[in-house]
Amino acid sequence: MGTRRRSARARARPPLAMPLAVLLLFACSSGVAAAAAQGIERIKDDPVGKLKVYVYELPPKYNKNIVAKDSRCLSHMFATEIFMHRFLLSSAIRTSNPDEADWFYTPVYTTCDLTPWGHPLTTKSPRMMRSAIKFISKYWPYWNRTEGADHFFVVPHDFAACFYFQEAKAIERGILPVLRRATLVQTFGQKNHACLKDGSITVPPYTPAHKIRAHLVPPETPRSIFVYFRGLFYDTSNDPEGGYYARGARASVWENFKNNPMFDISTDHPQTYYEDMQRAVFCLCPLGWAPWSPRLVEAVVFGCIPVIIADDIVLPFSDAIPWEEIAVFVAEDDVPQLDTILTSIPTEVILRKQAMLAEPSMKQTMLFPQPAEPGDGFHQVMNALARKLPHGRDVFLKPGQKVLNWTEGTREDLKPW
């Protein structure tokens, strides 16, 4: 970035004089929460009766003891791995007879070793995962007959089963070799990326449902903000010039629209953040270091049309959620034209997107509540697994056949856990 930037901590000016069409849009959009929407039948599927899952009983050092050591794991955005375990333990989908199971689940919490600042330390995650798989392969016959092809694992970290927070090193490491036949349930989703393999199930990051629901405003509240965003534009500690972080997309948002009265954008995170999103028509969801973030969840739940700025993103539950119908996609290179793009969308298109977002079943797909509720994120994962059935012939190995190489990996990853 050649121009010297104004501090991104300053808030863009609130709307002063808006075009008449925009004011009409606000007037029209205030009552769409109750509008009927079409095209969301698949997210209402009930997976019960369509598959059976066997949950391995592991020593508590792989799961319960880790949470007992640091309860912060229950509220960070990687907590899906914990709550998926709890969901399955009490679900009608669970079977106690492994011989009748369609899928096998290994409850290992690989993102629960946290720094004092709450960031996961994943240096030991590959060793922990390898140890858990060795355990199930020793005491049960089911892993060995498929080498994991009928097993699924929840790996919700930044770059999933690559187990590293920096992309370059995550790509260099690649997906943990012993997981290459398994189905991975992960938040990271980017096309043609070393950390997303074919057949993976992309899910939303964990956002506490009770926290979100505590901030709901009346559905008739007018949407008086045109474009809303709170978050970093520059990661000055890791990328001072702003050209690499978010591939420059966030920096471009700030430099082009910091003085635009239709854009309410800032790095400040107010206490009214959730309420503000419910007063906005569009919520920006740009990539950061990875394509995904909790903003996507928040935008959908709060009925704010997600503006997705992440060229190669693979969105959560994309086989069921009609993302093209509820979101707006803007190419990273087109960010300088963002104002023109958004103001050019016909009012009827915006109202249709808002009507679909207002559907309770749409909001439910983004959440992992406790206890589980019909149509929530847990059920969407189970539906995605059910759609993969029946397993193909290539899932089961011939007697004596081996595919995975247990000696493959870095020297550090091969150490005992």
From Swiss-Prot:
GO terms for molecular function: glycosyltransferase activity. One of its GO terms (biological process) is protein glycosylation. It is found in: Golgi apparatus membrane. Its EC number is 2.4.-.-. The chain crosses the membrane at residues 16-36. Residues 37-417 are lumenal. Its main location: Golgi. Keywords: Cell wall biogenesis/degradation, Glycoprotein, Glycosyltransferase, Golgi apparatus, Membrane, Signal-anchor, Transferase, Transmembrane, Transmembrane helix. It is an enzyme of class 2 (transferase). Residues 1-15 are cytoplasmic. It comes from the Eukaryota. One of its GO terms (cellular component) is Golgi membrane. Glycans are attached at residues 144, 405. InterPro entries: Exostosin (IPR004263), Exostosin_GT47 (IPR040911). It is a single-pass type II membrane protein. Belongs to the glycosyltransferase 47 family. Involved in the synthesis of glucuronoxylan hemicellulose in secondary cell walls. This is Probable glucuronosyltransferase GUT1. It comes from Oryza sativa subsp. japonica (Rice).
